[in-house]
Amino acid sequence: LNNLFGEITWFYPTQSSEIVNRSVTYNYMESSSQRPIWTTGSLARTTWVDSSVFGLPHGTSYNATGTSYDVVGNTEGATTYYQHETGTDQVKSSATTTVAANIESGDYDITQGQQGGADIRGDGEFIMKIRRFVPDFLSQSGNTQITLNLRDYPNSSQASSSLGPFTITSSTTKVDTRARGRSVSLKVANTGSAQDWKLGGFRLDIQPDGRR
């Protein structure tokens, strides 16, 4: 439990691992019955204590390069103790490591109606042209990377906009993209140290486009 952000996390080992190496999180604070919010990740913690005990969450993880033990049946290693929700990077043994993270939306397409007569719609049939987007962060430290992933068909591989990925600073007002496709998804990521962001409501300038 992380009551600072309304999250419940389960840490577990994957089928090929003997130790915890993955996690799945449910956000009960921002979820609804129609839109539950789940996230998955590689955060591995063997123990966890919520912020209600020490003021901030604390956890431990298995470290395979730690001390050896001459005990038959035990796995060699040691435990690393972490304090969470402080700063933007991982600090371990005086070394600072970037916490790379990203979030990506589902595919979005446009539905075009017909003027007069029957309302004939082709859901996902029309090519869209994305001229620009307006980034919106409720808070931002450092730079943030935005990628527009495009598809022409559901089974096609994703392709980034030819001008992307785009680097967003705290002073960026708009970004021209010249992207086109039947569907698009938005990926937001931090890739360097001292980067942090809280996503707001992005706006994309979209219009129907020809097939050629």
Task: For every predicted segment, state its role.
Residues 1-212:
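Beta-sheet repeat architectures centered on beta-propellers
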